[in-house]
Amino acid sequence: MTDAVEYPDLVVVGAGLFGLTVAQQAVERLGVRVEIIDVRDHIGGNAYSYMDEETGAEIHKYGAHLFHTSNRRVWDYVNRFTSFTSYVHRVYATHDGEVYPLPINLGTINQFFHARYTPAEAKALIDGQAGELAGTDPQNLNDKGISLIGRPLYEAFIKNYTAKQWQTDPAELPASIIKRLPVRFNYDNRYFKDTWEGLPRDGYTAWMERMIDDPRIHVTLKTDFFDGSQPFNKAALAAAGVPVVYTGPVDRYFDYSLGELKWRTVDFREVRYDEGDHFGCPVMNFSDADVPYTRAIEFKNFNPERHDSQNPNKTVVWEEYSRFAERGDEPYYPINTEADKALYARYEELAKAEPLTVFGGRLGTYKYYDMHQVIDTALTAYEEQVEPLLKK
């Protein structure tokens, strides 16, 4: 390291939605210079997408990303950088040779039981089936699921899907993993209930490029914060007194000194079909144990408004497999056992002793966030933590 390095006013580690939002706000509000570094070769974090030339599909590289929010502040903010399609997310599940709508609703119930229950009749049925374990304290996820929606629906749609997600028999999983299982006693199969919903009209990556389209923001990709050979490394920035917004894994920041936080990860297997549409929907869950993957994503079906620019004779599907993450895997979902929560609380105490570093995002705070929640927490963190640091 030489004295010749001219440091920016702020370094953001991670070019995901949290980091991009903070960088955009810092430049807009204070006119500072910001350097964003990311170990990956693209911006956008897990929301990054790219176009598949053969099919005309927009591939969500890290799995399906659907934007939805009821937060007016977030909706107004994101609409500064993109407009959204009218896409409404609906999910279907294949079970025992039939396709059902999800979340479980009156249509699912009547199809499953070959009936035509009214809302009140369906509710009475499910309450009765859920009463199988009445008076007991569920000791595992299996019992909790049955106590919430009854054995027939739980075993059809939840049990094996959950076993595949966790690679563990639900009877061996803690009941605390599920707080509730939504059942709708009407025919509404909209997946999300938020006020606003859609997909960015010209893609996720174009949206995020516009967020940082400012000469005062510089992005350096394929750059590791912990690599001492590059100028924006942890030790050099600390020595120079440069404020840092860190969105990488919080345990990695502290060199795993207290132990590793546990995550689940996802693997994808790509399948191409010589037909224009394979599933007829964007996401198909597979609820049965004999299909090894949890769900399949058919990306073309997220964007029906692009039909004319898509290949009518080809489609691409990603099958999604879930497993426990090991070091080096992409962490997706925090496992959040009681031991993990206690470990994160100890890392949080260490973080408080880092006055020039603001921790954020899923990895930096060991939380699962939807996109709108990441943006909301980033706007708040900028106002409450980052701007005061920059004004010192």
Regions found by a protein language model. Give the residues of each.
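Dinucleotide-binding Rossmann-like beta1-alpha1 core, especially the glycine-rich loop
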Residues: 55-131
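Active-site/ligand-binding neighborhood in enzyme catalytic cores
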Residues: 96-101, 106-242
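Beta1/beta-strand and adjacent pyrophosphate-binding region of the FAD-binding site
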Residues: 3-18, 35
